[in-house]
């Protein structure tokens, strides 16, 4: 008997709600907010980045077709966390607060992301 394997989940450096900057690809330099993370494929959906169009057929008679736009996922290795205060992208490090909580900190600015 074979065991059913659960899909591999990758540890990602970004979380939903983070402000990031795209560092490679067609949308290089764009800054946006992470709307969704997909840990199984290590991808993120970012607001205003990698926008695709989809032509939707009419579902009912008399209804007209539409052209829908949506944000497609991009790989998490193509994004860096972005400091809105300093206007700079940075890698992250993990540090502990005085209370003993583990938080993410931007290496360039020292700004703590997790509040």
From Swiss-Prot:
Q: Which GO terms describe its molecular function?
A: rRNA binding; structural constituent of ribosome
Domain of life here? Bacteria
* BP-aspect Gene Ontology terms: translation
Q: Which GO terms describe its cellular component?
A: ribonucleoprotein complex; ribosome
**Which InterPro entries does the record cross-reference, listed alphabetically?**
KOW, Rib_uL2_dom2, Ribosomal_uL24, Ribosomal_uL24_CS, Ribosomal_uL24_KOW, Translation_prot_SH3-like_sf
Q: Which SUPFAM superfamilies match?
A: Translation proteins SH3-like domain
Q: For this UniProt record, give its keywords in alphabetical order, as a comma-separated list.
A: Ribonucleoprotein, Ribosomal protein, RNA-binding, rRNA-binding
Q: Report the PROSITE patterns cross-referenced here.
A: RIBOSOMAL_L24
**Keyword rRNA-binding included in the entry's annotation:** yes
Subunit structure, interactors included: Part of the 50S ribosomal subunit.
Query: What does it do?
Result: One of two assembly initiator proteins, it binds directly to the 5'-end of the 23S rRNA, where it nucleates assembly of the 50S subunit. One of the proteins that surrounds the polypeptide exit tunnel on the outside of the subunit.
Q: Mind telling me which PANTHER family this protein's record contains?
A: MITOCHONDRIAL RIBOSOMAL PROTEIN L24
- Protein family according to the UniProt entry: Belongs to the universal ribosomal protein uL24 family.
Q: Which HAMAP family match?
A: Ribosomal_uL24_B
Q: What is this protein called?
A: Large ribosomal subunit protein uL24
């Amino acid at each position: 008997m074979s065991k059913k394997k659960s899909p591999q989940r990758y540890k990602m450096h970004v979380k939903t709600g983070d402000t990031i900057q795209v560092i490679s690809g067609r949308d290089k330099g764009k800054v946006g907010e992470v709307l969704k993370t997909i840990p199984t494929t290590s991808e993120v959906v970012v607001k205003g980045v990698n926008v695709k169009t989809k032509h939707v057929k009419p579902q009912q008679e008399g209804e007209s077709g539409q052209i829908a736009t949506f944000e497609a996922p991009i790989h998490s290795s193509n994004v860096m966390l972005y400091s809105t205060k300093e206007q700079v992208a940075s890698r992250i490090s993990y540090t502990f607060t005085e209370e003993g909580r583990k938080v993410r900190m931007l290496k360039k600015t020292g700004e703590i992301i997790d509040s």
